[in-house]
Curated annotation (Swiss-Prot):
Signal peptide stretch: none
UniProt protein name: Histidine--tRNA ligase
Location within or outside the cell: Cytoplasm
Enzyme Commission number: 6.1.1.21
Species per Swiss-Prot/TrEMBL record: Blochmanniella pennsylvanica (strain BPEN)
A GO BP entry: histidyl-tRNA aminoacylation
GO molecular function, one term: ATP binding
A cellular-component GO term for this protein: cytoplasm
Catalytic activity: tRNA(His) + L-histidine + ATP = L-histidyl-tRNA(His) + AMP + diphosphate + H(+)
Superkingdom of source: Bacteria
InterPro entries given in the database record: aa-tRNA-synth_II, aa-tRNA-synth_II/BPL/LPL, Anticodon-bd_dom_sf, His-tRNA-ligase, HisRS-like_core, HisRS/HisZ
Gene, per the UniProt record: hisS
Amino acid sequence: MLKYDKNIQSVRGMHDYLPKDTILWQYIENILITILDSYGYKEIRFPIIEDTNLFKRSIGEVTDVIEKEMYNFTDRNGNNLTLRPEGTSGCVRAGIKHGLFYHQEQRLWYLGPMFRYERPQKGRYRQFHQFSAEAFGQIGPDIDAELILITARCWKKLGINHHLSLELNSIGSLSSRINYRKKLITFLEKNLSNLDSNALRRLYSNPLRILDTKNTKTKELLLNAPILSDYLDDDSRVHFSELCQLLNLLGVPYRVNPYLVRGLDYYNKTVFEWVTDSLGVKKTICAGGRYDELVQELGGYSAPAIGFSIGLERVILLIQEINNISILHKNIYIDVYFISIGDNSRKHAMLLSENIRSTLPSLRLMVHHGGDDIKKQFYCANKHKPQIVLIMNEKNALDKTIILKNLQSKTQEILKHDAVSERLKHILHITCNSTDNK
């Protein structure tokens, strides 16, 4: 047997998630999937590795993601490839390839790992996971409102809605931003001494990114800077006004943040973020916006679009921070543990357990394997905290009976095999009583 090399560790900023962790992951993902499905969104899957040029064309070369954060490599054929730093570009590329956007509306969702070479810290990792939704082919503010409503519904279902607030802005059209960019540069040039090194680096290449600076001195300076909303084109102004009216009608609270711009170049018009102060410092849990030009920019037919991405690690941190884990107790442990004593009973235990699963597919039933004595089997059962233990010995196997031990009520009974499922259904209040389609 090979010895484990103590020096082999996970890559910095990339984490293992054990069964005790994935319970919460699965719970969150199932809620998000169920909500997206109820709105008619369908899953799409695409590779985690893409051609590097895809991200350079979509995200913008003068961005932190492209300049500093991408995992790039060259394969054996000399192709320049990248581990995806975000999902929208790959989703659009896949949609173009398979003709999803040609005179069609599409509502899609996906989840999976993304990769950015950043300094690891709480809630920010080099491999992180996003749950995202994208809607293609709809130009009006009503689809913007729908995506925001979806996220609001997700927070409520997860029990974190009181710890999140919505921030909105419109960054207008490309021509709007070009006009504003000139005014912003002129203002900043008069205040160079108040700019930090990052702001100075971005001054002429991507000055709008200075608006979301974390530097206190630069933030104070920007209070007197020109505001992007004053330079919006009429179409963007009307679009944003109608979106705000819709959110007011729908009862979704929000704050207009004139400094919200997002870090990727493909955005236009609506941008939004759900933020929290419950993690010590202000953190973005979810971000999104419109990208009406991206499909055409990447070689497809013109298709307006909007999407959002939820950072799953940050959602988990927030749930843990506010101690909202009571929702998981029912999912942590199994319902039934099956103990068997003797070679013949083990075979019959497996047969009976499969019949029970076919009748009660939602039942969490674990069968003990390996022929341990009854003391060891009960020890293993107790680790999983079942409500019911089923016990089958050789006599039970012969007369087709089973011992049902209710650990909660501390009662015990003997049942015929064909009566076990109905009894479990009654004790555990299982409502689903369907049969497997095999």
